[in-house]
Every structure is written in structure tokens, then in C-alpha cells.
Amino acid sequence: MKPPRSRSGSSKDTGPKRIPGKALKSASNPGENDATLDSATARTARNKTVSLRTARGRTTAQQRWLNRQLNDPYVAAARKQGWRSRAAFKLIEIDDRFKLIGEGTRIIDLGAAPGGWTQVAVKRGAKHVVGLDLLPVDPVAGAEIIEGDFTDPEMPDRLKDMLGGPADLVMSDMAPNTTGHAATDHMRIMGLAEGALDFAFQVLAEGGSFIAKVFQGGSEKDMLALMKTAFSSVKHVKPPASRKESSELYVIATGFRPERLLESSKGA
């Protein structure tokens, strides 16, 4: 078993083709019967330390990744509850704090593979959920999944038609394949985040929200300045499910103000 590669919903990245991580055991109704208990299950999960039985034929990096997976309580909880990836708990923890998903919410999930965030959105009562990815994604009960590129000029209108109106939440957990060079990796993920933000501006309803993965670094100041103009609140968060050694953060923007964005563009 090899580590899964990351994925995105845009074809403009020049790196290797993205392959969605192999989905964990999936369930039509993942998580606990009471959705408020989903994150608590992960927090209380405990694994006995497990070691690989054999390292034969595996590189050091593969051994390290496999050992990490075997001893990760979020991986164990995802398998037990039927989430497609441990990343589902990141969105659960973000939503526990910011209350972005509720009954009647229209949601677009950019770079949806393998479907964990889409599952969470449906489980938490969203009215309409559309997941978009360049690569095939197994169906998620209660959501629509399409293959496509979010940079396609026709995509914003297409997804709004599928939702039956503008989106209340655009979320992106997209990440490029990492190179190991911090500056390069940061620039790549910021390019995806900026593209997702531009897409969000085209599809969000007034008062809507935006979530995107970013890496810690210094080149996102222009993006943050634009977000602070277009949204009433912009915050960074590192959910507990995000690995401590990872430099990833999530930017949470709420209260979309399209008129402020229009004023800003006129004054530019």
C-alpha cells in the first residue's frame, strides 16, 4: 500500500496527475447517529501503538507513512464511522466552531475526492451539495458529484443551476502534490486557494462563507486583504485533526459582501 497523492479541482497545475486517496470504508450514513458526537468520537479515540510486520520492499518514506496511518486515532475513527478520509474530522471540527452548515445550506465542495467533506456536508443537513473534482469520485448519498475543472468559465453558472441558486458555502480542501521545498509548496497551494476564492466570488450568495486550505507562509497577504474587503470576518484555524507536524491551516471567511467587492474593483 502506497501513500495517497493529493488532488485538486483544477487542471492548471503543472505537477503530476493527482490521484484521490483510496477511500476508507464508506457508509451511506457515516458517523454517529447524533452528528454532534462525531468529533467527540475522534477526540476520545485511542490506538495501541502498532508497528509494521515487515518493511520488505518499502522505502523509508513509505514505512514512515504507513506507521503514521496505523497509529493515527483519526484514521481509526474514520474507518469505524464510515468516513472516506480522516480529513472529514477537520471539517467536523471547523463546523463545530463556526456553524457554517445547517438545514437549507447550499454547498460546493471543490476538489471533493475522495468525498469525506461532501459526506460531512450531507450528514450535517445541507439542502444541496455538489462535489467537483477532476477525477472520478464514488457517489455520495444525498449529494451530486461531477467531474470537471473549477476554472472552466462555464462552471460557476453550471453549479449554481445544480444548486438551484447561489451557494451559501464554498469549501476547498485542495492541495498540490508536495515537493518538499517549502517555498514552492506554499506557492502552489496558495495558487489553488486564490483560484478557489475567485470561484467563490462568482457563486456565493450575500452573507455566504468560504473555507480553504492554506500553508503557513508570507505570500498570502494580498489574498487576505481581498478577503477582508469581501467578507465581514476572516480567521485562520488549525483544527485538532490537522497533524501537528503539518504546516496547513484553514482560512474561514464569513459574511460575504459582494457590494464591497464591487466597490473595491471600481476603485482599483
From Swiss-Prot:
Class of this enzyme: transferase
Residues that, per the record, bind S-adenosyl-L-methionine: G115, W117, D133, D149, D173
Reactions accelerated catalytically: uridine(2552) in 23S rRNA + S-adenosyl-L-methionine = 2'-O-methyluridine(2552) in 23S rRNA + S-adenosyl-L-homocysteine + H(+)
Active-site residues per Swiss-Prot or TrEMBL entry: K213
EC number annotated for this UniProt entry: 2.1.1.166
Family: Belongs to the class I-like SAM-binding methyltransferase superfamily. RNA methyltransferase RlmE family.
Acetylation keyword on record: no
GO MF annotation list: rRNA (uridine-2'-O-)-methyltransferase activity
Organism annotation: Gluconobacter oxydans (strain 621H) (Gluconobacter suboxydans)
Location of this chain's protein in the cell: Cytoplasm
PANTHER family named among the record's database cross-references: RIBOSOMAL RNA METHYLTRANSFERASE, RRNA METHYLTRANSFERASE 2, MITOCHONDRIAL
GO cellular component: cytoplasm
Main location: cytoplasm
Gene symbol of the encoding locus: rlmE
Pfam families: FtsJ (PF01728)
Record key words, sorted: Cytoplasm, Methyltransferase, rRNA processing, S-adenosyl-L-methionine, Transferase
Entry-linked HAMAP family: RNA_methyltr_E (MF_01547)
InterPro entries found in the cross-reference section: RNA_methyltr_RlmE, RNA_MeTrfase_FtsJ_dom, rRNA-MeTfrase_E, SAM-dependent_MTases_sf
Protein name as catalogued: Ribosomal RNA large subunit methyltransferase E
Coiled coil: none
Keyword Transmembrane recorded: no
